[in-house]
Amino acid sequence: MAGSSSLSTLSLCTQSPSPSPVASARLVAPAVLGFAGAPRFPTLRAAPRRLTARAVAGDAEDEWGKEPAADQGGAAAAVAEAPADVPVTSEVAELKAKLKEALYGTERGLRASSETRAEVVELITQLEARNPTPAPTEALTLLNGKWILAYTSFSQLFPLLGSGSLPQLVKVEEISQTIDSENFTVQNCIKFSGPLATTSVSTNAKFEVRSPKRVQIKFDEGIIGTPQLTDSIVLPEKFELFGQNIDLTPLKGIFSSIENAASSVARTISGQPPLKIPIRTDNAESWLLTTYLDDELRISRGDGSSIFVLFKEGSTLLY
């Protein structure tokens, strides 16, 4: 399952018209998720073999820069060899399990300590060295579907993620990217929830393949989803106040009337179409470099060596 604002962080620089202070502040967030093409996941045989790991930092650094010449390498190689007696599939599975464990409780990287970040970077480097899909854009069907953001080192996204520390106001429920390789489109989406409603902010974009690992993304429009109001009021039969039990049964009729009114309002508002805002600017595009890709895990690198780890919807890595 890259920036212009917090969302634009994942791999793109997006500028959109400012319909309102609130809308414009949130529209940039979805533009953040970057991505690259995807190849089919090759069959990994259990036969042991030695692997040479290459650091991909060099490729990632120029994601937003000019496309380098084909013969320009730029990245120092960090060699890591896999034990000859360890099957590649088992080794990759073990690394992914360790990565999942390292990301637990980090809130997409917001709460990660320096030690955890160092561990995550080390695990990512080892996975990149064993990337089963060295040329993602040559097999885009593997990139198809919805990807959920599990971790990022992109600091400009943290203010948005930090809203989750105020559960009484707004909480970021999910940041995702949905890719359609047949139509060459991508949608970045952030879902928010509050005490009385849920909504989403997303961006739609087109992408073009520019190299075996890189794609160019150009955003077309921003979308503010119609708020979905909470239309159910749960009222307990009684509660305790200063040691005294208060019976709320006589109030159920009153709250039932309020709930019916709320349901009517919710249906009316939820039935309205989402607000679409065209993005018409030359700066609403970005590069994305994919450094690891299989059928359940995607790792991308962005400007300033930012890292994005995404899990495929339905993957066991999410649970």
Curated annotation (Swiss-Prot):
Pfam families xref list: PAP_fibrillin (PF04755)
Keywords tagged on the record: Chloroplast, Plastid, Transit peptide
Family recorded in the similarity comment: Belongs to the PAP/fibrillin family.
Segments of skewed composition (Low complexity): 1-17
Ranges where the record places region Disordered: 1-20
Compartments in which it is found: Plastid, Chloroplast
Protein name per the record: Probable plastid-lipid-associated protein 2, chloroplastic
Xref: InterPro entries: PAP, PAP/fibrillin_dom
